[in-house]
Amino acid sequence: MAGLTATPEAVAGRVASIKDAVTRVGTAASAYADISTKALAPGGSTADTASSQAELVSEIKKLLAEVQGPFRAMFDLFGSLSKVAALRCLAEMGVFAAIPASGEPAAVDEILSRLEVDVDRALLVRLLRITAADGPLVEVGEETYAQTAFSGVMAHPDLVATFKHIVDESGPAITLMPQFFIENGWKQPTDPTNCPYTFAHRTEGSEMWTHIAKFPERQKNSNRAMKAQSFDGVWSVGLFPFAEKIKELGKDTDASTPLVVDIGGGAGHTSAQIRELCKGIEGTVVLQDLSEVIADVSPTEGVVAMAHDFFKEQPVKGVPIYFLRRILHDWADASSVTILRRIADAMDRELPSRLVIAEQILPTRGISSESALVDMLMMTFTGMERTEKQWEELLAQAGLKAVHFYRALGTPFGAVEAVLA
């Protein structure tokens, strides 16, 4: 093809680019090693480590792209789809639990004998090939495989459920997204009953959450995925000074006083952390979620669990802090405004009550690949990640105003503090 013919000049230029990329990887690796060591010391920041790791990963990807060249890089996009499909098949078969987590190798026939489902040997061999070509499994002999640290997580119940949930729910929606827009117009989806997800899954008028609930196994995977997700970025809860803000109010409290309402708080990991951050202040953190979620919550001292649908009237009024973590990115603006208005109606202007939203706050440029990927996944069912300006505009529609944005250097996770406008 014109412009892509290998000439001495082109080869020399490519070699120079590769050497430059190698240098950048070395620099990023050294920085990561240094920051990771400092993070282990008292006062160290995991946010700094996350930022440095993201920079290292970015530079490694750039190096890989330089070495591969455009054709190989494009081919690898298709290879990634094939590998995901193979991994999903192996996860369903139970293969990752059939290969020793210790790293001890297992031959194909051994793996087959440990599976609880009937699997054709030739099929298993072909699926294992692609997962061992460059990971996550490793091929240690003819038709013999062993686990790696990467593949080992696929045997963890919550993590494999998360993987299944993402592949089963988002996979078809991402793949058919172009066709959805071709048929429905090139505009941002805002109707949860007419979006890439509903198009791909043929939900017949149901939005995603209602559709998933029709399938017990998929609902189970979804619940476990939400549980696993509750740990992701949980450190960012500490960005907001809960105790300081509550003490500023000068309000007398006792053991039964609601200090914070954690709305849509899931399994309660965040609620427990907030209560710890408010150590020394009498009162409780109210954990709210749907009844089926609350039913599985383990008791935690200082945390009161309550069944609640955040689209309905907020029953706990006049609390110092209302807290939303990774909720609004699941919803388009119209639905998000409804959620916010329910909270605003319960807030005390004189106190004043505060709303704290822990979410990604996207930069206006230079977004990370991870944040962009999450935003694409959210788009499949009308959700979205938002910039500072978009958060301000969203809050204004609900009669609220942002008064402060809390951020950690090098990470998109932050906290938006808002009061009644």
Kindly label every feature range from the protein language model:
Residues 366-382:
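Short, glycine-/aromatic-enriched active-site segment of Class I SAM-dependent methyltransferases
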Residues 383-399:
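Short alpha-helix
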Residues 2-5, 22-33, 39, 104-106, ...:
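Conserved adenosyl
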